[in-house]
């Protein structure tokens, strides 16, 4: 288990400074690797189950091997630095590249700002950046819902899970997780093209998020009073509605926030979580939930290692 100061500083750097330029962003590099090997293995759009399953598996293995090697070597170089201030700072900065705390808040808050300014078209375009559904026909309620769903789901993907994996496995753990998560975002969805090619990525993402998503949900329950929610309602949402989404993991944080803040979240034709009106105040409180759950995680981790 690594020193808590690395996690605390990494989240601080990401939350208040933000991500590096795209040219040097590790996740962008991972995405380019995925595309490179996809072009090698899947040069045609024709569907062949056995071939696509096999080549999709090879794509995942090769990218993860490269990411592991690079992260491991970087970690070894950093750990060899004798000056503790430089070592801790550099490690934390590199680690912050695997976290998306600031971007999660900013992307989720953008549609809310458009709604406040009565710019529905701007809100539709903005929320399209954070969800895969068609937003052209969405009204105010469903735009706010999509924004809140994205924020609550990505508490796990963007922050809690990377912190958990770096805590246990160091930099390689954080960036291997980020690679799997990037795979899932790029080829893990059930389109015709990626139905079989993306299965390995999708299954691996589900496995790696199984425990972190439930930890994130419990953090949201405990911190409910701090973001304007209710512990009892959050508890109900986690245990009664957490399994109501197609994903085996994303529903736990979404249902917890929805019920805690007494609001209904809905992806039309797919799922409904919680009950109650979605207001601007509740939408903003759902973003506060992100900050408080991360803060509690860092406090608990620090106390456990004292």
Curated annotation (Swiss-Prot):
<keyword id="KW-0169">Cobalamin biosynthesis</keyword>
<comment type="pathway">
    <text>Cofactor biosynthesis; adenosylcobalamin biosynthesis.</text>
</comment>
<protein>
    <recommendedName>
        <fullName>Probable cobalamin biosynthesis protein CobD</fullName>
    </recommendedName>
</protein>
<comment type="function">
    <text>Converts cobyric acid to cobinamide by the addition of aminopropanol on the F carboxylic group.</text>
</comment>
<dbReference type="GO" id="GO:0048472">
    <property type="term" value="F:threonine-phosphate decarboxylase activity"/>
</dbReference>
<feature type="transmembrane region" description="Helical">
    <location>
        <begin position="207"/>
        <end position="227"/>
    </location>
</feature>
<dbReference type="InterPro" id="IPR004485">
    <property type="entry name" value="Cobalamin_biosynth_CobD/CbiB"/>
</dbReference>
<keyword id="KW-1003">Cell membrane</keyword>
<feature type="transmembrane region" description="Helical">
    <location>
        <begin position="88"/>
        <end position="108"/>
    </location>
</feature>
<keyword id="KW-0472">Membrane</keyword>
<keyword id="KW-1133">Transmembrane helix</keyword>
<feature type="transmembrane region" description="Helical">
    <location>
        <begin position="155"/>
        <end position="175"/>
    </location>
</feature>
<keyword id="KW-0812">Transmembrane</keyword>
<feature type="transmembrane region" description="Helical">
    <location>
        <begin position="54"/>
        <end position="74"/>
    </location>
</feature>
<dbReference type="GO" id="GO:0009236">
    <property type="term" value="P:cobalamin biosynthetic process"/>
</dbReference>
<comment type="similarity">
    <text>Belongs to the CobD/CbiB family.</text>
</comment>
<dbReference type="GO" id="GO:0005886">
    <property type="term" value="C:plasma membrane"/>
</dbReference>
<feature type="transmembrane region" description="Helical">
    <location>
        <begin position="17"/>
        <end position="37"/>
    </location>
</feature>
<dbReference type="GO" id="GO:0015420">
    <property type="term" value="F:ABC-type vitamin B12 transporter activity"/>
</dbReference>
<feature type="transmembrane region" description="Helical">
    <location>
        <begin position="286"/>
        <end position="306"/>
    </location>
</feature>
<dbReference type="Pfam" id="PF03186">
    <property type="entry name" value="CobD_Cbib"/>
</dbReference>
């Amino acid at each position: 288990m690594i020193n808590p100061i690395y996690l605390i500083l990494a989240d601080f750097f990401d939350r208040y400074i933000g991500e590096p330029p795209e040219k040097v962003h590790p996740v962008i590099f991972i995405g380019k690797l995925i595309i490179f090997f996809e072009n090698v293995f899947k040069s045609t759009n024709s569907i062949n189950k056995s071939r696509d399953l096999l080549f999709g598996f090879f794509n995942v293995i090769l990218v993860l091997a490269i990411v592991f090697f690079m992260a491991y070597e970087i970690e070894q170089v950093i750990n060899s630095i004798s000056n503790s201030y430089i070592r801790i700072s550099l490690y934390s900065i590199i680690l912050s590249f695997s976290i998306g705390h600031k971007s999660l808040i900013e992307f989720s808050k953008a549609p809310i700002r458009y709604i406040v300014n009565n710019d529905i078209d701007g809100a539709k375009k903005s929320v399209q950046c954070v969800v895969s559904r068609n937003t052209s026909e969405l009204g105010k309620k469903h735009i706010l819902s999509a924004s809140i769903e994205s924020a609550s789901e990505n508490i796990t993907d963007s922050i809690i899970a990377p912190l958990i994996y770096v805590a246990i496995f160091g930099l390689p753990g954080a960036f291997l997780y980020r690679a799997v998560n990037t795979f899932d975002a790029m080829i893990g969805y059930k389109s015709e093209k990626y139905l079989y090619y993306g299965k390995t990525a999708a299954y691996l993402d589900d496995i790696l998020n199984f425990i972190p998503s439930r930890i994130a949900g419990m953090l949201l329950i405990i911190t409910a009073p701090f973001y304007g929610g209710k512990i009892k309602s959050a508890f109900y949402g986690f245990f009664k509605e957490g399994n109501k989404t197609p994903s085996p993991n994303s529903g736990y944080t979404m249902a917890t926030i929805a019920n805690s803040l007494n609001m209904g979240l809905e992806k039309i034709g797919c799922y409904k979580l919680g009950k109650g009106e979605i207001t601007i105040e509740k939408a903003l409180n759902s973003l506060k939930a992100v900050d408080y759950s991360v803060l509690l995680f860092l406090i608990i981790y620090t106390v456990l290692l004292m």
